[in-house]
UniProtKB/Swiss-Prot annotation:
Family, similarity comment: Belongs to the gamma-glutamyl phosphate reductase family.
Cell compartments where the protein resides: Cytoplasm
Gene3D superfamilies: Aldehyde Dehydrogenase, Chain A, domain 1, Aldehyde Dehydrogenase, Chain A, domain 2
PANTHER family registered for this protein in UniProt: DELTA-1-PYRROLINE-5-CARBOXYLATE SYNTHASE, GLUTAMATE SEMIALDEHYDE DEHYDROGENASE
GO molecular function: glutamate-5-semialdehyde dehydrogenase activity; NADP binding
The organism's taxonomic lineage, starting at the top: Bacteria, Bacillati, Bacillota, Bacilli, Lactobacillales
The name this protein goes by in its record: Gamma-glutamyl phosphate reductase
EC number: 1.2.1.41
Keywords for the protein's UniProt record, in alphabetical order: Amino-acid biosynthesis, Cytoplasm, NADP, Oxidoreductase, Proline biosynthesis
Amino acid sequence: MIEELGLKVKTASKEAAKLSTAEKNTFLQKLADSLVENTDRIISENAKDLAKAKGHGISEIMVDRLRLTAQRISDMATGLRQVAELPDPIGQVLQGFTNLDGLKIVQKRVPLGTVGMIFESRPNVTIDAFSLCFKTGNSVLLRGGSDAIYSNMVLVEIIKENLLSAKITDGVVELLSDTSHAEAEKMMQADKFLDVLIPRGSARLINRVKEKATVPVIETGVGNCTIFVDESADLDMATRIVINAKTQRPSVCNAAESLVVHAKIADEFLPKLQNEINKVHEVEFRADERSLKALSAGIPATDEDFGMEFLYYILSVKTVDNLDEAIEHINTYSSRHSESIVTHDYFNAQKFQDEIDAAAVYVNASTRFTDGFVFGLGAEIGISTQKLHARGPMGLEALTSTKYLIDGCGQIR
């Protein structure tokens, strides 16, 4: 199956690269309309995935990641329209000059080629990944999780129907419907067809892709995000920020998983936070010995807890004596995604932003803002936590490469 699908997307990538900006934008706008028109059809297929998930006893938080409603489908359509309105990076000239030999050298943006996307649960990723790849002249091979197979299949069917109506080869998007681990590993090693592989999901998925893939990988989004409450922090502000980052949507990668508190305010802040957060939702605190003394309820934290992406109403807590200790702790356990400091000390804020090794570093704000739309990128294909090629929310430019065009008049060397 991988051989057949890989050849299709590889062949189609040549046509995708030739599409004009107007052709791409017109198609994305029509696809947005088509999604809304097919709302009932999509929800009907999504219901099969939801029933299967509930039958397997999956938690409601994880079921929510699968669920497609009329509003969420409308939001997906809005995302398509926003991508259509974004500037097309393909063909953008980054630099141009004439060298000492008289050669005219231009560097411009071009598509990556063929993108492989391996992801879990959220069927909206099917639309996000396709729209960004299509806008940047790439073809894409999608492999979603077995838990969202019916949703992913109907979404790809709708995309393909619209491609055929627009007289664009439908090979610019293919779905690996065999969700077995064996087929997934074949996809990870399909380097003769795929130019890049982007995994999006749990730490387990991403680590497996890194271990097995021969296709170049852009690592995304394990989100062990931490908030440090400094001694000068406004404790009301800190409480609001932590509650939002932990409880607003705990199953996403930019939710807070860990809290670090300065010892001078721990006895005042931790009871206040625990009281207020439990009014929103009961949260389990896994805390070090010093933090436990300030909490009315909690369990002892292990080293593993400080590095864990819980994706649930669980928060690890560490008390530290100073900013340097906080930075060292965060850099030790962080997944390099998003970290935040709550402080009124300008120099501590600057030091934190300078020394924390993460894709996004906040001062006095929730980590929940790390998102392609918020950062002005439109839809995102993922949030990269590595340093090569792309880092942070990955929009259109992250799905491009560059090439040099050199014009001469007979020069030799």
